[in-house]
Amino acid sequence: MDDASPLSNPAKEPAALRSLLGRTNRDWWPNQLSLDILHQHGRHGNPMGDDFDYAEAFKTLDYFAVKRDLHALMTDSQPWWPADYGHYGPFFIRMAWHSAGTYRTGDGRGGANSGNQRFAPLNSWPDNANLDKARRLLWPVKKKYGAKLSWADLMIMAGNVAFESMGAPVFGFGGGRADIFEPEKDVYWGTEEQWVGKGAKTRIVEGKAFEDPLAAVQMGLIYVNPEGPDGSPDPWASARDIRMTFARMGMNDEETLALTAGGHTFGKCHGAGDAAKIGAEPEGADIAQQGLGWTSSHESGMGDHTITSGLEGPWTPTPIKWDMSYFHMLLDYKYELVRSPAGAKQWQPVNPKPEDLAPGAHSPDRRVPTMMTTADLAFAMDPEYRKIAERFRDNPDQFADAFARAWFKLCHRDMGPKSRYLGPEVPAEDLIWQDPIPPVDHPLAEAADIASLKAKLLDSGLSVADLVRTAWASAATYRGSDHRGGANGARIRLAPQKDWEVNEPEKLARVLGVLEKVKADFDASAGGGKKISLADLIVLGGCAGIEKAARDAGHAIEVPFAPGRTDASPEQTDVESFEVLEPKADGFRNYLQVRFSVPTEELLIDRSQLLGLSAPEMTVLVGGLRVLGVNHGGSKNGVFTDRPGQLTNDFFVNLLDMGTAWKQVDDKADDLFVGTCRRTHEEKWTATRTDLVFGSNSQLRALSEVYASDDAGERFVKDFVRAWTKVMNADRFDLPRAQRLARAA
């Protein structure tokens, strides 16, 4: 090879060119719309293959054998990373906690549901320092059970067993978390260019709420800075940060305190020496480290010499035993500010009693003082937190129950409804944050009933647009990130969804009134006790509308429909919890509530990813929904057809027509455009960025060309129906996987 080539001498070229591929398109055009998040975790990167069903594999797992192996591992200290106090329990708790703790309610992303802690950036976050060793300790267990036990489930299960092994109460465990095999591209972690401790500043300025959907207060943290906001040892300001960030993770004050107190009953922090002696994180470490990071040159670099957060010491004198000592140490002592050996700011009890000293983590005959972080002291200083802490201290049973429930919620919040939980230790109790729906308690409508109902819906006075728009509004709340939302439950008829601006409350109320009458008539007249839920009827209305629209366009097609949805009650619906599902933008309905700092087409990509759609599926749905007339407020933007209500490919044909010239309506705003005839200069169409992106972006234009072709009519209708069915069934976890994902047989 020529020595002048950058391939033979990388030093001759800048880092951006040190690749066989050279610069990427994104390097040249940083603002280029990326569709990558729609195609992540595809079959080509997944070694398990398309046919692998993790839920079915998990059902064959010897669950209690895994638990026995984990119990044995807790006290099987390894010389390459010895266990503090001879017990790995606290270490695995931190690993599980930090796996689940990235969840945020704003977009449902983060959390433990995919085993994402194995990949960048999480595997190299400062707050996850040394958790690479925890996962390596678990490898023999993962290796033994293979495909039957995902990393995602194993990490949470290890945390659960760790608590059990040290006497803590647990509420249960549900498996079913399938692993990913590449880093997530869809999660927005922030724009900062430095980690916490490396220059990143707090996101909370003057007590004001920080950017949605973020939950952690600094880049690289799971929750808050334990030393206080920006490292300032101010417990009162820390209380504000804690309350804000835990609320964004779906926790109230009681859950926050129970969870923290229970977790900090165990283990210790590590700051034995100069943090400058810590090596690179896993993603930046040398290849010989084999994926391990944070190698320390401080004495042995492990055991009593470990450096992780920089804080040093246990919270309690009994760091591997469930008891009430955390509250005793928190509430019964005065504290003074000190520095750890690594220089971190922490608090030490004043004149601790001998019995309140802790054993050394690797030298049990040595007695060491306990400590509290600034974040811990927030629970003693903040009046509301202190009231809860005192109540827990005086009522150990209340604390135990609150902790067990909060830990279960933390670890399962992103798994969706309880029907997705697997294993013999799933709690029987329904919990409001699981968005429960009642079971089916009646015979379901059969084929003849469904055909009759479709006819009645089409004869009800509701238009195709009414039927399709309502079905879309019901189903499109689904988020694949945490498996919330969707059509099952018919919560579109309940607060808060019935009042959302995007759902056009007056129109929605009119449509629901008609559907409720159709339901009542069917329930009263159907034989054999058969009933139809409103949830099913809403979706069936969409099916009927699409079939009519296709027929009117010359295409006979049956839209798949699977009855079995039920209707949730107001008592099963936490209104505040559902408010985060309200779409502020829905490109499928050409709706934008407020202007965002990012282009509206990026919001369409984001929503499509949450719905589990590919770029072709997104494309065909937008084109079909435009001509069916489901735009918010009856807007004509993007309705590129002279036969609205028919399922045609007119959107694509007219978008790609070179006889039309486009320009912004207002030079000061780039979200509304007018299309005029190049020859006559007459206005033909209006459009938003969400419409025009299908002609301007090269990838989306290539897809649009497929559907705009003269021979594409039938393909367009079939692809639209398949993508539509996928959205309608997104939350039907009771259906076979292939049917739920609307895969062709």
UniProtKB/Swiss-Prot annotation:
Using the UniProt annotation, give all residue ranges assigned to the region (Disordered). 345-368
GO terms for molecular function, please? Answer: catalase activity; heme binding; metal ion binding
Entry's transmembrane regions? none
EC number, as in UniProt: 1.11.1.21
Q: Where does heme b bind?
A: H264
- Pfam families, A to Z: peroxidase
Q: Which GO terms describe its biological process?
A: cellular response to hydrogen peroxide; hydrogen peroxide catabolic process
PTM: Formation of the three residue Trp-Tyr-Met cross-link is important for the catalase, but not the peroxidase activity of the enzyme.
Kindly state which keywords UniProt assigns to this record, in alphabetical order.
Heme, Hydrogen peroxide, Iron, Metal-binding, Oxidoreductase, Peroxidase
Q: Which superkingdom is the protein from?
A: Bacteria
Q: Which catalysed reactions does the entry list for this protein?
A: H2O2 + AH2 = A + 2 H2O; 2 H2O2 = O2 + 2 H2O
A GO CC annotation given for this chain = cytosol
Q: Where is this site: Transition state stabilizer?
A: R94
From the record heading this protein, give the residue positions of the covalent cross-link Tryptophyl-tyrosyl-methioninium (Tyr-Met) (with W-97): Y223-M249
The cofactor note from the UniProt entry for this protein is:
Binds 1 heme b (iron(II)-protoporphyrin IX) group per dimer.
Q: Where is the active site?
A: H98
Q: Does the keyword Oxidoreductase apply?
A: yes
| NCBIfam families for the chain | cat_per_HPI, PRK15061.1
The similarity comment for this entry is:
Belongs to the peroxidase family. Peroxidase/catalase subfamily.
Q: How does it assemble?
A: Homodimer or homotetramer.
- Please identify the protein, giving its name as recorded: Catalase-peroxidase
**What organism, scientifically named, is this protein from?**
Phenylobacterium zucineum (strain HLK1)
Tell me the name of the encoding gene. Answer: katG
